[in-house]
């Protein structure tokens, strides 16, 4: 149990205004000190067990209702929560970079990254970075067993800096036929042009972002929106909060 609280009259008035008793507040503080139990999962969600699947006819009906809503002047805005940082995705890569071992353990996340390095959408950008920073291609670094240099080029500031970027800024999907890749932000824009364009021909997008990353999103949107407008033949208006 955490040490007993000392509450002022103002504290007591404040918690009382929120419907919280001193005893309840102490219980909450104790919980923060002792931690929370893990949830017990009863199984995976599947169709018929937590997931509802629409039939082909129901899908068509839903699409028709949506299209009719838009045709009748209904307002649509694609809302995208985009404040998530990518740092947790790269936890095992940071651990390897900071660790004593220079070779990733067989079967580890880092080994899987190295084994599949050419399959990532960001591989061309990574290869450019390693040629600039190390004067070697990624594949040459693999041959030289310079695995930490490769990982550093992915997650640190001297490379792609993915360990410090929001998830929305990572090159995520590859489009070989177009010779490009898309970030999640660009995919959200593309999805919006297919699903949420108003009869006026305008797509409204709203992204919630971390204040620390706002400038990054503004720059990406300024770059991505004109290309998406030309591709889809629509006007795109985006806002951030």
Descriptions of predicted regions:
Residues 4-47:
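N-terminal regions that are enriched for targeting/export leaders
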Residues 15, 37, 41-89, 94-241:
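Domain-scale recognition of functional cores that engage charged ligands
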